[in-house]
Amino acid sequence: MTLLSTLARRDFLTITAGAAIGLALPRPGATRAADAGERGARAKSVILVNLSGGLSHLDSLDMKPEAPAEVRGEFKPIATALPGVQICEHLPLLAARMSRWALVRSLSHGENGHLPGQHRLLTGATMPNQRQTDLDNVLSRRDWPCYAAALNHLRPRRDGIPSGVTLPHALIEGPLTWPGQHAGFLGPGHDPMLVTQDPNSPNFRMDTFALPPGTDAERVDQRRGLLEKLESGGTGDPAFREHQRHAFELLRSGRVAGAFRIDQEPVKVRDGYGRNQFGQSLLLARRLVQAGVPIVQANMGIVQTWDTHVDNWGRLKNRLLPWLDRALAALADDLDAQGLWDQTFVVVSGEFGRTPKVSTLPGETIPGRDHWASVYSGLFGGAGVVGGRVIGKSDRAGARPVSPSYAPFDIGATIYESLGVGPESEIRDAQNRPSRVCTGAPMDVLFQNR
């Protein structure tokens, strides 16, 4: 008995195309925009390093050693490769490589909530129909599309390479699946691919894109032809046919399959990134952009990993900052060694920073810092970014910007423009209403010499 005779046609496609555990395969369905606002691209790929929960800028990239103790915290600053510029003592590898990065100390917006803040970071837009409570603001098809989804909508690919991959997991906390992680109102056909395995696990394997044993490309093409004949008997579903085509292209793309074989990296390289989820996620991100994936979102931890209301300094010192320091240093060095630094735009940011004043939550004994979107810091590098400088400034308490500020919308516009898509590009929602894909302004200052 043949495989096809024992399976429904779509089940057969799903299995043959490798929609296996560990990856969510998109299902194209929305209509693309007429005008992608095409322009010259600075980058071939973007890596968004998402510090979900909100990194304390005061204890990392914008320290205030002269401030009172309740502001400055417990850490000491150290010198960097940039004269007169200091960052946290627990970021020594980054400090030595600051000539690669532009450090922006005047990121700012007005949303102190995790869910709407992350939506802004991941989409470059405010949340449509934002509600009052977190339970009402979870992931939905009302969301604005994330960068990979909008790119897929505006610039559909035909080479078997996904427009975006999110790793190493989605942002989910109990009943809350954080918004901004998929195609939103553009429909599930444009959702980015989602890795749901820890690349640091010794059992990490993404067989999703591998041909089954004994199956070659010619046999896949034969199966595809058979499915097309079967589908031609009726009107069919155009969205499903597009999904079918995309699935077969992914299956035949050895570049995608090979990117997930992180076990093929030399031990020295893997060790250099750090044998933890942060490090191996950024190594996998490098492999994906090397394979041609245009947008990789690397979540550095679960949803509130950087949400240091309690034990701010212990959590940062003992794990978060050392892991991030090593991983970012290795990523920058590796991208450069592979000839990818100049064609990859790297963004490192959370949804906001932390409060200037140290506080202790009711019922807790170990202090921390609360949410603070009024000013915070981020790192930008690669793809023409002029590194080795600090852009923007906060006040003496790290509470407000005292120079021109940049919002997540501007980060989003810069991501789009770096890939050659104008932020004024038009997308249409489910009601066919036109909108700019991003209302922000590109951060041209990143690419300008002083």
What is the predicted role of each segment?
Residues 1-450:
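Ligand-binding pockets and gating/stacking loops
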